[in-house]
């Protein structure tokens, strides 16, 4: 009995410590991928992306180690009111050695307060750096609506027929603005702050199993006093988005239409590039003139076709029409079927095609890419992760144009512009060729 009594304080202390640890538990989430690959003609794994396309089909076609490590915690709660602190640090290396030093990217650090406004139950106030309501196509790693960055907002306001969200974020360009210099010389190497103001109305039930989301984004260059932009800079622009999501075959289908103007056309996802400049090989700012418009029509989804088959798919048309004729027309179509041999083993195939036409030359670049992978994953869904896969990829391309980045923009009037593949006896784009790669990769999110 004496021994039991002596052990009691220790047991109480341990229990209190466990309860305290549970109360202060930190949420750990993230994403990572890494692997090793070879190229059929020799050397390390090559990855294949069509010149002018903004993404590539990713299965068996990723050549880097990438990770996002998220730590977060609910730091205060009283009734239904709470504060949550969230962080995210990302890393990317070329996966060529054991020791690969890299500077981390501090991508998220924000606080979200839920139900803090009595007359707006269910809403969230937030401020800080944040991945904000991002919309993407997983199989091509393409974010078509993403205003992430430092910002603040009020989201998920219940308006009866949907949820209203308001936000403002910042996306600064590395250069583009200039202060006065002697002899009226401007270098345009100062950072340009771009503000984006976002309004969304989501979760509107428009048909059985279907919801509609509408959004408007306005972006503008926010100059400091006595600074100026390059003559003809776009300064501002708009992005309009409509997305219909339909529940179908134990999955979903998303149909998206987007239209953007001027500064919102460069990235086409909601981030503004108001100064409209870039830097050449000599770090000299040159005008890329993103005045114009963009139209994007996109359909993508993931479905289940019986007990053994799942499939992802995408089809997209995008037309960037710039006043300087340096835009592109890009269309892409692809599928990723998955056959499940057991609840944890599957065979996955990805077939994708890209075609990009240059507005300036009228020429087209195209690429076919096919990957076959044997995969072991934590579950029987096409979304199940972690996954370990061995793969073989074949790509064939024929490119008739490329971008001219020879010399610098002060002496090369075509710098940064699309030119035919054999322009001035040179070689632009990737030509007409094909290649095999093979390897192994892990992918995880949690």
Curated annotation (Swiss-Prot):
It comes from the Bacteria. This is Maltoporin. GO terms for biological process: monoatomic ion transport. Residues 26, 79-80, 116-122, 160-161, 206-209, 249-250, 306-307, 342-343, 379-385, 446 are periplasmic. The lineage of its organism: Bacteria, Pseudomonadati, Pseudomonadota, Gammaproteobacteria, Enterobacterales. GO terms for molecular function: maltodextrin transmembrane transporter activity; maltose transporting porin activity. Pfam families: LamB (PF02264). The gene is lamB. It catalyses: beta-maltose(in) = beta-maltose(out). The keyword ATP-binding does not apply. Involved in the transport of maltose and maltodextrins.
């Amino acid at each position: 009995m004496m021994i039991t009594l002596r052990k009691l304080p220790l047991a109480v202390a341990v229990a209190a410590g466990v309860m305290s640890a549970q109360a202060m538990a930190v949420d750990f989430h993230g994403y990572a991928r890494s692997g090793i690959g070879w190229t059929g003609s020799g050397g390390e794994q090559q990855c294949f992306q069509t010149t002018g396309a903004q993404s590539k089909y990713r299965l068996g076609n990723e050549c880097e180690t990438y990770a996002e490590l998220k730590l977060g915690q609910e730091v205060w709660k009283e009734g239904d009111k709470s504060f949550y602190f969230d962080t995210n640090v990302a890393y990317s290396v070329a996966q060529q050695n054991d020791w690969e030093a890299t500077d981390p990217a501090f991508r998220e650090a924000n606080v979200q307060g839920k139900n803090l406004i009595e007359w707006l139950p269910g809403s969230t106030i937030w401020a800080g750096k944040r991945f904000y309501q991002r919309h993407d196509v997983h199989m091509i790693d393409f974010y078509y609506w993403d205003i992430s960055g430092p910002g603040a907002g009020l989201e998920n306001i219940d308006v009866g027929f949907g949820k209203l969200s308001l936000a403002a974020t910042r996306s600064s360009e590395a250069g583009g603005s200039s202060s006065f210099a002697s002899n009226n010389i401007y270098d345009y190497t100062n950072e340009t702050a771009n503000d984006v103001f976002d309004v969304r109305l989501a979760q509107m039930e428009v048909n059985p199993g279907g919801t509609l989301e509408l959004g408007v984004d306005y972006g503008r260059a926010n100059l400091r006093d006595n600074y100026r932009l390059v003559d003809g800079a776009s300064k501002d622009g708009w992005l309009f988005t409509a997305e219909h999501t339909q529940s179908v075959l134990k999955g979903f289908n998303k149909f998206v239409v987007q239209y953007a103007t001027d500064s919102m056309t460069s990235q086409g996802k909601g981030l503004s590039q108001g100064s409209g400049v870039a830097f050449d090989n000599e770090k000299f700012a040159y005008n890329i003139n993103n005045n114009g418009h963009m139209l994007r029509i996109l359909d993508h989804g993931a479905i289940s076709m019986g007990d053994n088959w799942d499939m992802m798919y995408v089809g997209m048309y995008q037309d960037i029409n710039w006043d300087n004729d340096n835009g592109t027309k890009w269309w892409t179509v692809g599928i990723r079927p998955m056959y499940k041999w057991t609840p944890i083993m599957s065979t996955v195939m990805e077939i994708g095609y890209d075609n990009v036409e240059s507005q300036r030359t009228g020429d087209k670049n195209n690429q076919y890419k096919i990957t076959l992978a044997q995969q072991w994953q934590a579950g029987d869904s096409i979304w199940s992760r972690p996954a370990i896969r061995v793969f073989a990829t074949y790509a064939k391309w024929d490119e008739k144009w490329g971008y001219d980045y020879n010399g610098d923009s002060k002496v090369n009037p075509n710098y940064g512009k699309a030119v035919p593949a054999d322009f001035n006896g040179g070689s632009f784009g990737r030509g007409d060729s094909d290649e095999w790669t093979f390897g192994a990769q892990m992918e995880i999110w949690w």
